[in-house]
Each structure stands twice: as C-alpha cells, then as structure tokens.
Amino acid sequence: MKIKVKLPDGKEKEYDRGITPAEIAKELGVKKAIGAVVNGELWDLKRPIENDCELRLVTLEDPEAPEFYRHTMAHILAQAVMRIYGKENVKLGIGPTIENGFYYDFDIKNGKLTEEDLPKIEQEMKKIIKENLPIERKEISKEEARKLFNNQPYKLELIEEIEGDRVTIYRQGEFVDLCRGPHLPSTGVVKHFKLLSVSGAYWRGSEKNPMLTRVYGTAFAKKEDLDNYLKFLEEAQRRDHRKLGPHLELFMLNTEYAPGMPFFLPKGVVVLNELMRFSRELHRERGYQEIFTPLIMNEQLWKISGHWDHYAENMYFIEKDEERYAVKPMNCPGHILVYKSRTVSYRDLPLRFFEFGRVHRYERSGVLHGLMRVRSFTQDDAHIFCTPDQIEEEILGVLDLINTIYGQFGFTYRVELSTMPEDHMGDEAIWEKATTALKNALERAGLSYKVNEGEGAFYGPKIDFHIRDSIGREWQCATIQLDFMMPEKFNVTYIGPDNKEHRAVMIHRAIYGSLERFFGILIEHFAGAFPTWLAPIQVAVIPISEKHNDGAEKIAKRISQEGFRVFFDNRRETLGYRIRQAQTQKIPYMIILGDKELESGKISVRTRTGKEIKDVDLEHFVETLRNEVLSRKLELLMEG
C-alpha cells in the first residue's frame, strides 16, 4: 500500500506504507538528519510512517533538535545511574526535557546521590555516548509493560494512567524506559553535555508522595554553545536573588513557619515603597482611582465568581460563627463590588480602579522559589470598566503605561496576543470586536506582536508581556485581559444614553504583576546594584578616623535633610573594611572625609564601582544627587 508524503518544498512523493524518515533522508541525500516532524509531531528517524503526511527532516541545526538530543541525554543519565548504583537499587521516576536542559528523578535504595557524585556519573555517560548504542522504539501491550517494569513502582503507576491498551518503550543497550519520545537514532550523536545540580523533588509534585532525587543537566549540539551557556549560568548564579536578597538585607524566608510567604526587611521595604510610589504617581496622572479591598470575604462571593468551583484547591479558607470565608486569591471580585456599590451612567465611564492588593494562593512546596513563586504576594491590580466602544482607547492607555514603567528600568519586551479558544463563552461577534480592538491598539502603539490563535482564556482575549533582563532572560509580567465572564456573573451594568441597562466591559490588567516577583527580577536584573532612586541606602558617609566624626556627621545630616537615605558609618572598623562593606552592600555613593576634606570644605566621592571624584563641592553633589533621584536615572550621574 502506498502513502503520500508532502515535503517542505511543496512536492508530494509516494512511498510504501511503513517507510521511515531515515529512508526518506537517505533518498533525499540529507545525511545529517536526526529526526523528523510528521504532521506537526516530533518523530524518530527510524519510526515507520503509516499514513499520508507532511514531513520535514530535522538536523542538529533545527529548533526542534534540542527536544531530541536532550531527551536522549536524560535516558543516558538514567542508564549511567543504574550502572553505577545497580539496576536493582534504582527506581526510576520521570526524565523530561525542560527549557535549556533536562532532568531525571531517582529513588536510590541504600544510597545517596549528591553533587559530589556528578563527575563519576558524567564519566559513565561519556562511556555510553562512546558506545554509540542504537536506540530502538517499540510499542508493547500494557501487560508486557507491567512484566518489563515489575520492579519499577513509579513506572507501573504511569502505565496504569496511560489511555489505551498499548504503551511505548525505548531501549538502548541494557537500558529500557517507558517513554513517548522522541529520541536520537543512537547514543553517540550528541557529545556535549553537563550535569548541573541535584535537588529533592516529590514524586508527582505532591508532599504526600516519596521524595526523589532529581538530577539536572544540559546538552548542546556544539561545544561552544555549551560553554557559553555554562558562563551564562555562572552569571545567573551571581545574580540569584535568593542569595543577594538576604546578603543585602532585603528580605528573608522562613520555611518552618511561613513557607512561600516572604518577610521584607527594612531595606527591602524601602525598595517596595519606591516601586509603589512610582506606580502610584503614574496611575494618578492617568485617571486611576486607588482603592483597598478586604483580604477575607464570604464564600458566597467566590461561588458567584466561579473561584469556588474552579480554584478552591488553590485557596485558603476560614470558618467562623458557622460562616465560611476565603482569603482572596484575586482582587477582581472585590473591585466589582466597589463598582456595583452605586448606579453607574455611561457618562461615568471609563472607571479605572487600582489596588496594591495582597492575595494568597496555595502552591505546592516543591515549586516554591524565592520571590518568584510564592503563596502570599501583592498585585498591582487594576480593573477598567468601560463600554465596548472604549476598549481600544483604554487598551492604548494601558500599553503606554506599561511602556513607561518598563522603560524606567531599562527593560525591553515582546508581546503576545492570545485569541478566542474553541471552548469560549460569550458571543463570537463580541470576541471579534474585542480582539480587533486589541490588535488596533497594539498597532497604533507601534508594537509588533505574536498571535497565539485559540489560546486566550475562555472568558476573553488577552495580551501578555515578556520582559528581557540584562542577561537576556525573559520573564512574563504584565497582562491585559478582557473578561466577558465576570460582568455576566455579577451583572455588571451601566445606564446608557437610552436610559436602559447595558453590560459593561471589564479589563483586568497588572504591570508589575506580583510585586514580590518583580522585586526578585529587579534584584537579578541589576545584580543588587539598584539605581540610586531605588537604593535602600543612597549615600554612605565615612569618616577616616574618630577625630573626623563630628564634621562627617554634619555632612551626613545635611544630605539627609534633603530627603536622601544616608548611612553615617562611624563604626570602629578600619577605613578599608567600611569602604569594602559599602561596596558589597551596593551603596551608590560613598563620601570619604578626613583632614583635607573637612578643612577645604570639599568632599571626596567614591562610587560603588570604585571611581573616585575628588574636590567636589558638597552643594554640587547634593544637586547632582537630587537630579539623579528625581529623574529616576538608571546610571550614576557622578560617574558621567
């Protein structure tokens, strides 16, 4: 029986049913093929093709290639661990690819795998790569699979959850794994890898299950790319907010009493307050009204909103006086209650409510991560209530606000627009009008964007913003979401020109997103060296010796009187120690005062990067500092 295969150049060829991409690659002279994409699905090179299809061969140069070779590297890792610790002692979890790498979870009997063991595992992996073992894909019955994995409890659990009567396994040498693929043709195709770290991970992410040992690794087709990535990881570690935050006395975490709920220390609160002050200024200028809504509200509210049915497992509850309350996971229902507290005319619209609202959402302990993934956080939430005809202008205003805020921190960003999914609610004509309004606003703002067709929420289209930090990482922060569901559930209306009720449009939007997460991103973006306007301490005044204390204290008070955050460091430590500590605390400016400075009335200024500026007039320094802080400059003006 023949099948038709359509190639990327548009040509269609006939082949015998059961032909493999490897055979097609040979015919076409594509010697470097490692796999294929068949009807949009990643496909092993030796896997038979049974039906008509569109086919594209994949080489190591293609964007799909990492999925093949990193998945195979995870299997090579598991095979190496079983060789070292003994097949009978290792229970296998899962080993997927992740962004820029892979991992595998192990349950090792009578043994402990630590980061000190990674070099010997790497050596065994190199042996497996050198053996260049063929990788074979096979479909077997569930009954066969149960026998094959009879000593692998985690695999047996997975087998029972797979739909249908057959499962897929992969074999390389003595190693067999339950896996959907895709994989390389053999273990010797890609040689450049590195095991990165070891951590604990609960099976299936649940604290009720056993804790497994997770080994992370990465792999690249070229050694140069691997080396560059490892350098990138070193830089990322240097910037890790989980290390810098406590070191700079910004925040602390207490996993015993408040897991996932950060404690902000005095210096961290300074930064948070500056972020909120900056945001409030811009929101006031743009006609937003700040409100404050309760942290705990009755269960009936959450039943109306739908959170009770669809989000309860992520919520915290309180029972008092035979009434059930929920700690709010989102701010929108509260904002709707504020809107509905009075009759609204079309003349009142748009109404823009804004809140730094504290929310709580349960996250499994295994996914908590510093400030980036927490259970308690503050959202810079706003909800705009408007008429359908006002959508475009309101979105345009939000886009301008986002651009202003992100530009202040030196962030660039990319934009994604997600459109109507199949299981949407609401009239398609309204969806079409709303989506067109979003597109028009993006285009009027001069923003290029990617369209994710059918990936909007069921209750409305949305725009997502992915900011890029100083080392090129992307973070999803701002969101603009149109909502057709909440106004219907809560009967959110306004009185139109015809004196009748009309359904209002509701726009959810956040710019920082989670204030805590944005703070963590900023710590890593600036490597803890905040611009002066954000810095917890802006100036350290350091007398050279005890006899200079009085004069230095007067200068510290003079600068402090101007509203700047000053640390007068008259501790009985060496001058070198105090300067070094100011530098490690990332204080933008140090004023060093000795006989010469106090006699001349001129000061010596040293920046945190080590640049020295001598004979500076104090009032000139104060004026420069004022300009730098009021204009929220990113750079240190005294270095200019």
Curated annotation (Swiss-Prot):
Cofactor annotation: Zn(2+)
UniProt EC number: 6.1.1.3
Residues of the TGS domain: 1-59
Alphabetized CDD domains for the sequence: TGS_ThrRS, ThrRS_anticodon, ThrRS_core
Catalytic activity: tRNA(Thr) + L-threonine + ATP = L-threonyl-tRNA(Thr) + AMP + diphosphate + H(+)
Keyword set, alphabetical order: Aminoacyl-tRNA synthetase, ATP-binding, Cytoplasm, Ligase, Metal-binding, Nucleotide-binding, Protein biosynthesis, RNA-binding, tRNA-binding, Zinc
Chain's gene name: thrS
Domain of life assignment: Bacteria
Quaternary data: Homodimer.
Stretches for region Catalytic: 240-531
Listed NCBIfam families: thrS
A single GO cellular-component term on record: cytoplasm
UniProt-annotated location(s): Cytoplasm
Top-level enzyme category: ligase
Cofactor note: Binds 1 zinc ion per subunit.
Family: Belongs to the class-II aminoacyl-tRNA synthetase family.
Function: Catalyzes the attachment of threonine to tRNA(Thr) in a two-step reaction: L-threonine is first activated by ATP to form Thr-AMP and then transferred to the acceptor end of tRNA(Thr). Also edits incorrectly charged L-seryl-tRNA(Thr).
Protein name (record): Threonine--tRNA ligase
PANTHER family noted in UniProt: THREONINE--TRNA LIGASE, CHLOROPLASTIC_MITOCHONDRIAL 2 (PTHR11451:SF44), THREONINE-TRNA LIGASE (PTHR11451)
The species this protein was found in: Thermotoga petrophila (strain ATCC BAA-488 / DSM 13995 / JCM 10881 / RKU-1)
Transmembrane segments: none
Molecular function terms from GO: ATP binding; metal ion binding; threonine-tRNA ligase activity; tRNA binding
Binding locations of Zn(2+): 332, 383, 508
